[in-house]
Design a protein with these regions (language model features):
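Pre-Walker A adenine-sensing motif
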Residues: 15-25
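Conserved P-loop
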Residues: 26-104
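Conserved nucleotide-binding/hydrolysis micro-motifs of P-loop NTPases
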Residues: 39, 51, 65-70, 116-117, ...
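Loop/turn-to-beta-strand initiation segments
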Residues: 58, 106-109, 138-143
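Short acidic, glycine/serine/threonine-rich loops at helix termini
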Residues: 71-76, 153-159
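Conserved ATPase-coupling elements of RecA-like P-loop NTPase cores
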Residues: 114-129, 153-156
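Substrate-engagement module of ASCE P-loop NTPases
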Residues: 127-148
Length: 160
């Protein structure tokens, strides 16, 4: 009986971890950057999603903020939506990115609007970019948006 390298790795736990993590390719991150709200970042992100869908890519939307814009909402048609996870805070319910649902669904590409968003207290991670990091680590490509004005809030992180 011949043992394969993978069989040996199953026996030795540290190597099993290595096999599982080395064979998973990290997802790519694409960011639509804009100077202010309303300049078309989300609209452009949704346009790219439709182009990818036309090429046969498995694309889902996890968080898309239309801000009441009809043209943007219309572009959501035909894109599978992952429902938000609701977090209760001070008697109110807030929708947040459902990372676990995205990981279970495991699409090729997921849309996550507003990368610099601060999650509701009680969420798994304090910031949405940390949620996105988990999705990327699972090998899923993320397309997101950022307002330049929100980058100033990252000064503390950059200094560290």
């Amino acid at each position: 009986m011949t043992l394969l390298f993978a069989d040996l790795c199953a026996i030795f736990t540290p190597y099993r971890w290595m096999i599982e993590h080395v064979t998973t390719k990290r997802g790519q991150l694409r960011i639509y950057l804009g100077a202010a709200p309303g300049v078309g970042k989300t609209y452009a992100m949704l346009g790219e999603a439709h182009r990818r869908l036309e090429r046969g890519t498995d694309v889902v939307a996890a968080v898309v903020e239309t801000h009441g814009r009809n043209k943007t909402a219309k572009l959501l048609e035909g894109i599978e939506m992952i429902p938000p996870r609701y977090v209760e805070y001070r008697g109110a319910r807030f929708p947040e990115l459902d990372v676990e649902a995205v990981l279970r669904r495991h699409p090729q590409v997921v849309l996550v609007d507003e990368l610099a968003h601060t999650n509701t207290p009680g969420s798994k991670n304090p910031k949405r970019w940390q949620d996105v990091q988990e999705i990327l680590d699972a090998g899923i490509t993320v397309i997101s948006t950022v307002n330049i004005q929100h980058l100033e809030g990252l000064n503390d992180v950059v200094e560290q």
